[in-house]
């Protein structure tokens, strides 16, 4: 039998005690007391923070939203079907954050920044909290740089600047998403990173958007964040904040970013659902009292930073869907008051073939032409007023046929300008192309061309400029303003092209009044002769 030596045991025990490293892990743990509709009520988390991430069983996370006296109301982010009453919940001590960085570009992710495009994991360089304070007044500078959308109707009358918040508002099926996508496609090669945030849309619609962006090469500089209609309300609520955090990474690194929220009406509905399930008191239209703050704290994060902060910018194009054109409803008026202007798209204009269906009278940019390049301002500054006056005159002209010559000229010019501002989808124009065609419209080059030929005139003009006047376009793009010399060259180019166009299309010219009168007399004589013969 082996003899036990006390000194060896003592030595071993002393060694164990000396090497013992006391690591005590303390977790604050609570219990699920009720669960339903994506909302969990928890007991025992006395030191829980508002907005803190909570760890549930089966790898599900939640976010604390209601801090009550004896319990915590949390929203669940993910599949909660396996969680039961009585399950344990742990505090993480962290605020919800999402991955950010250049690796996000070209990817489709959900509200938590997890990839959903089957292209593998994302090696993100950093993580940002979804809720961040907006930059202060000292950290900002005024909006001065233009952000071209490529749409004549917007760039010439409702110019948008980098760092601005411009609302796109209208009924369903009026082309709101199309305007936003055109802006993304037009951003190619303009040093702009785009983030498209789809909130509460059908997966098929989002797939169509992603395919369109890929087809035009726009995914190379775009991040797509998706919270589809089939996902629970907490994911819809988080989506715009997560997307903004991803866009802020580029802004904070001195780059320029554009974010599109499509749309904030569904975001407000998701927040209303969450609030009612959390038993918060309802207000107007059953929305909670802080629904204004919901959108104001989101949209205030879009800004143009000062040079000391890197000079980056984040431009926001939130989308709001109205019901039967009612812009005075609760959510539309809230977002109109938060943003720096709105682009109002009208169903009647859309159905009559005016696309983009921008209602010039109700649309406005509160930054104005300080954000537009000077050449656009020179050719388009009177356009909005001319079109508004044309609409008024057109309404009155229906009641009487005897119009003086000045009124008739104004109506004719208005018809041609309206036709000129129509634009096919996904065909954005450069600033210099817009300057040329708007100059032609506002300076009377189209006054003697029949309205049905305006579209052909415009298409031919772009081909002519590319083939014969490339230097002129380059000079407009470089100078960004029309001086006397450049204005003369523009007129010469337009006169030359117009003559060629009329030679090819002889019936495109409007007959002069003398010729029209002679034709009318001839018709009357022929009718009188025919009557006498009978």
From Swiss-Prot:
Residues passing through the membrane, by range: none
Catalytic activity: ATP + H2O + 4 H(+)(in) = ADP + phosphate + 5 H(+)(out)
UniProt entry keywords in alphabetical sequence: ATP synthesis, ATP-binding, Cell inner membrane, Cell membrane, CF(1), Hydrogen ion transport, Ion transport, Membrane, Nucleotide-binding, Translocase, Transport
InterPro entries on file: ATP_synth_asu-like_sf, ATP_synth_asu_C, ATP_synth_asu_C_sf, ATP_synth_F1_a_nt-bd_dom, ATP_synth_F1_asu, ATPase_a/bsu_AS, ATPase_F1/V1/A1_a/bsu_N, ATPase_F1/V1/A1_a/bsu_N_sf
Region annotation (Disordered) ranges: 505-534
GO terms of molecular function: ADP binding; ATP binding; proton-transporting ATP synthase activity, rotational mechanism
Subcellular location: Cell inner membrane
An example Gene Ontology CC term for this record: plasma membrane
Site keyed Required for activity: positions: 363
Positions annotated to bind ATP: 170-177
EC number: 7.1.2.2
Membrane topology: Peripheral membrane protein
Entry-linked HAMAP family: ATP_synth_alpha_bact (MF_01346)
Subunit details: F-type ATPases have 2 components, CF(1) - the catalytic core - and CF(0) - the membrane proton channel. CF(1) has five subunits: alpha(3), beta(3), gamma(1), delta(1), epsilon(1). CF(0) has three main subunits: a(1), b(2) and c(9-12). The alpha and beta chains form an alternating ring which encloses part of the gamma chain. CF(1) is attached to CF(0) by a central stalk formed by the gamma and epsilon chains, while a peripheral stalk is formed by the delta and b chains.
Purpose: Produces ATP from ADP in the presence of a proton gradient across the membrane. The alpha chain is a regulatory subunit.
Family label: Belongs to the ATPase alpha/beta chains family.
Protein name: ATP synthase subunit alpha
Name of the encoding gene: atpA
């Amino acid at each position: 039998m082996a003899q036990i030596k006390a000194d060896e045991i003592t030595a071993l025990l002393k060694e164990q005690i000396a090497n013992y490293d006391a690591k005590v892990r303390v977790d604050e743990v609570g219990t699920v007391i009720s669960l339903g509709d994506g909302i969990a009520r928890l007991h025992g988390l006395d030191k829980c923070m508002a907005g803190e991430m909570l760890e549930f069983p089966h790898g599900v996370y939640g976010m604390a939203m209601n801090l009550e006296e004896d319990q915590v109301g949390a929203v669940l982010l993910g599949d909660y079907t396996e969680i039961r009453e009585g399950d344990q919940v742990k505090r993480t001590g962290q605020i919800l954050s999402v991955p950010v960085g250049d690796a996000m570009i070209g990817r489709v992710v959900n509200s938590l920044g997890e990839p959903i495009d089957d292209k593998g994991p994302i090696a993100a360089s950093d993580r940002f909290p979804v809720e961040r304070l907006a930059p202060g007044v000292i950290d900002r500078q005024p909006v001065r740089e233009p952000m071209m959308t490529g749409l004549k109707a917007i760039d010439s009358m409702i110019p948008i600047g980098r760092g601005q918040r411009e609302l796109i508002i209208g009924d369903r099926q009026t082309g709101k998403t199309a305007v936003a996508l055109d802006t993304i496609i037009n951003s190619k090669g303009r040093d702009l990173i785009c983030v498209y945030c789809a909130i509460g849309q059908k997966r098929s619609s989002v797939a169509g958007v992603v395919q369109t962006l890929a087809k035009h090469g726009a995914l190379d500089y775009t991040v797509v964040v998706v919270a589809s209609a089939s996902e629970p309300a907490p994911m819809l609520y988080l989506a715009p904040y997560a997307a903004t955090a991803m866009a802020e990474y580029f802004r904070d690194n001195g780059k320029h970013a554009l974010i599109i929220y499509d749309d904030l009406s569904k975001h407000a509905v998701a927040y209303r659902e969450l609030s009612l399930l959390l038993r918060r008191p309802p207000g107007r239209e059953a929305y909670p009292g802080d629904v204004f703050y919901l959108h104001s704290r989101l949209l205030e994060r879009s800004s143009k930073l000062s040079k000391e902060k890197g000079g980056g910018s984040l431009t926001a194009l939130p989308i709001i869907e109205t019901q039967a054109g009612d812009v005075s409803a609760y959510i539309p008026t809230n977002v109109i008051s938060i943003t720096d202007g709105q682009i109002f798209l009208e169903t009647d204009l859309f159905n009559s073939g005016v696309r983009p269906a921008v209602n010039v009278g109700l649309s406005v940019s509160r930054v104005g032409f300080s954000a537009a390049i000077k050449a656009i301002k020179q050719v388009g500054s009177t356009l909005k007023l001319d079109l508004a006056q044309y609409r008024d005159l057109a309404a009155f002209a229906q009641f009487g046929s005897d119009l003086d010559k000045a009124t008739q000229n104004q109506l004719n010019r208005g018809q041609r300008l309206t036709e000129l501002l129509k634009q096919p989808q996904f065909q954005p124009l450069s600033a210099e192309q817009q300057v040329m065609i708007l100059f032609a419209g506002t300076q009377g080059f189209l006054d003697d061309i029949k309205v049905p030929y305006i579209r052909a005139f415009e298409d031919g003009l772009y081909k002519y400029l590319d083939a014969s006047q490339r230097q002129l376009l380059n000079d407009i793009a470089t100078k960004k303003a029309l001086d006397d010399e450049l204005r003369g060259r523009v007129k010469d180019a337009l006169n030359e092209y117009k003559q060629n166009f009329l030679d090819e299309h002889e019936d495109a010219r409007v007959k002069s009044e003398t010729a029209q009168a002679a034709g009318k007399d001839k018709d009357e004589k022929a009718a009188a002769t025919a009557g006498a013969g009978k």
